[in-house]
Amino acid sequence: MCIPRRSFLSALPAAACLGAAGVVFPSNQAEAQDFRGFIAGVKAEGRRAGISDTILAQALNTLSPNTRVIELDRKQPEFTMTWERYRSTRLSEKRIAAGREQAARNAQLLMQVENAYGVDRGVILGIWGLETNYGAFQGGFNVIEATATLAWEGRRASFFRAELMAALKILNHGDITMPRMQGSYAGAMGQPQFMPTSFNRYAVDFDGDGRRNIWDSVPDVLASIANYLLKSGWHQGQPWGTQAIAPATIDPSVAGRENRLSLAEWARLGVTLGNGQRLPASPLPASLILPDGPGGEAFLAYPNFNVIRRYNPSDFYAIAVGMIGDMVMA
């Protein structure tokens, strides 16, 4: 999924903006001609990349830019999201209950995925739950249309042109049909909300049907999330982090992902577990995360915390993924 986002939107899953996709034709003849020229260039690039003329025609011949996509991409947030507010909306009782249901329903599959990739099943469930509520909300935009619109619109043309080409390669490979290739307005796709380039790097066919189907195949979804984390540096058998209590007098400058201390050093600074007990003996380095600053909740983040952030570069997101996983598997 890894797409640049602004302000508090960096803490939101990619499917957060799920407005229905409506084709909007260019407003004047010059724009229409410009878009046709853009599509001609995409077709030429696609042919050079080995994409069939049939796929290029099916995907691009009737395509028009979608102004709703442009509106959502340009929309600026009106406030800064606090961790307290983010937690209250993302870690709902309903989401946790649904996660426990999925953990029970897919227990054998999760064990197989965990054994194959060495990634903690709780974190896999946390990402699945946070991205699309376990597949319930995958986004309603056609990915080809969305990425083509943003590549043509120009503000991040090179980024989205690469995503458009990657999406065309997915169609050419036969993993999914164009009508089913649905996602967010920015092109994040399916249940794990992979960007097309991420799909081509990390998506796997775990159910053995010959297609990497992150829209409808739960085995492919869970294994693809695990593969993403594994290839991002996941440390097998290590936790993501833990809730903690930091004294109100602690120097705020020691907090942050850049500062890594041993648990013994954190203990000497007065940090305890979230239940008030002493920190355990462990060789793992940890960073103190204060998502709402001094006086708010505190977390000790281990190296796997930063691996989760490679899925979405937000402390809020990584903490929420870890907490959902912990609560679902408790």
Regions found by a protein language model. Give the residues of each.
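N-terminal secretory signal peptides and thylakoid transit peptides that target proteins
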Residues: 1-16
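An acidic, Gly/Ser/Thr/Pro-rich helix-cap/linker signature
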Residues: 33-105, 111-114
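Surface-exposed patches in mature extracellular/periplasmic domains of secreted proteins
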Residues: 51-60, 120-126, 179-182, 212-213, ...
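C-terminal soluble interaction/assembly domains
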Residues: 250-330
